[in-house]
Design a protein with these regions (language model features):
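Residues forming the flavin
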Residues: 1-189
Length: 189
């Protein structure tokens, strides 16, 4: 059972080199939740989360993150991981910079969990068949991301969930309800 565990946030997102400039919106809270679950099952585990910025979208998420720090002793380090190396003993060495202190960190851990950014799942075939425009980020474009995030440029075609952009499950369910309502209006004529 791994005792020292590190989470690395924003892998492949918020990164110009990777081509994904957007935040996936869910990774910080998922990592925090997983870290808490690990601590519940293994209280002696030492967990470090390396992050760029903690993004706590949603009601109660900021408190959830603070609770992880205080009650579960989960360590958060602001900084990008530069390198992960394997030791002869098959452990991993993480090299990173703590942005807040300027300190270079080299930490040996038993396990590294990468929080990879969300990417659009729409295949080229779906895009060509439906002829719905996609943005530079690859997600479907809607009438307006805040006012009307489900209506596409094609009458009767609606998006929901991560098809339109990164979001969590409650936001996806709410958006799916809105899309279903708009579709039912068309069907009722």
């Amino acid at each position: 059972i791994p005792k020292k565990i590190a989470f690395v946030q924003c892998v492949g997102s918020r990164d110009e080199k990777a081509g994904n400039l957007y935040c996936s919106r869910v990774c910080c809270m998922y990592a925090t939740k997983e870290a808490q679950l690990i601590k519940e099952h293994n209280p002696d585990a030492e967990i470090t989360i390396f992050y760029v910025d903690i993004r706590a979208f949603g009601k109660g998420f900021e408190e959830f993150y603070r609770r992880a720090e205080k009650e579960f002793n989960i360590k958060y380090v602001k900084g990008r991981v530069a390198e992960i190396l394997e030791t002869p003993a098959k452990n991993l060495i993480i090299r990173a910079e703590n942005i807040n202190s300027g300190e270079l960190i080299e930490e040996e851990v038993d396990m590294v969990i990468l929080s990879a950014g969300l990417v659009p799942a729409a295949t080229e075939e779906i895009k060509k068949t439906l002829k719905i425009p996609v943005g530079d980020d690859g997600f479907f474009v809607t009438a307006h991301p805040k006012i009307d995030p489900v209506t596409t440029s094609l009458k009767g075609i609606f998006t929901a969930g991560v098809a339109e952009g990164p979001k969590d499950i409650p936001d996806s369910v709410a958006q799916a309800s809105a899309a279903a309502m708009k579709a039912s209006i068309i069907l009722k004529g």
